[in-house]
Amino acid sequence: MTPQRTLTRTIARGMRAAARLVVRPASAHCDTEDGPVVKAGRRALISGDVNHALAWVHAADEDEVRTAFAAVAAGLGPERVGADRRFLETLVRLHRAGEGAGFDGIKPSGTPQPPAVTAADRALETGSLVPLHGLVDADRWQGVVERFAAASALKDHDNGDLPAARAAVAAYVDYVHYAAGHGDAHHGDAHHGDAHHGDAHHGDAHHGDAH
């Protein structure tokens, strides 16, 4: 490899690393208005099916999510609006806690995300890894390919099957985090341990929605 090519690759890698530091970490895209967790929560509110939301939290946290969801149904007028918001905040907070992350409120729509996170969602939506070309280091590419395959295989599932939905979410989270450069990102198990599947979506879990 020529010195010029080596320098070019080094600069490119450095720019990608800087982008990850300047923009918010991949795990944070789950606490934005545009992210997959809020989108799943809104699907639950619109459809009346709380399972869309439950896929994003541990089984141990289901009761708290169900209680917040029930409060929405019981609310009227302004009370309903407030209950909607509390439900979404409860959902995101518990999802974040399941990943060992803190929660300081849902970030506004349009909050910048690392390019690899946006591209990972786009790749899953289109069924092609092309959007991620040039955003992932060569030594991590095979790992991305494997995680993409797992997330793609699990994204279509019966919404009534929570273990399957949580497996999809786990696979999704693992894929996106890894694509963004976060370690081996075995979040799936860590996040939705009960699902043992690695974690999310898609269907709803997607985050395609997501993201």
Where do the model's predicted regions map?
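Non-membrane alpha-helical secondary structure
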Residues: 3, 7, 33, 57, ...
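Long, charge-rich, low-complexity intrinsically disordered regions
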Residues: 3-28
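Repeat-mediated protein-protein interaction surfaces in helical alpha-solenoids
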Residues: 18-25, 46-49, 96-104
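General secondary-structure edge motif
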Residues: 21-24, 33, 112, 155-156
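N-terminal Sec/ER secretory leader and immediately downstream segment
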Residues: 25-88
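Extended amphipathic alpha-helical interaction segments
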Residues: 88-161, 165, 169-189
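Long, intrinsically disordered low-complexity tandem-repeat segments
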Residues: 185-210
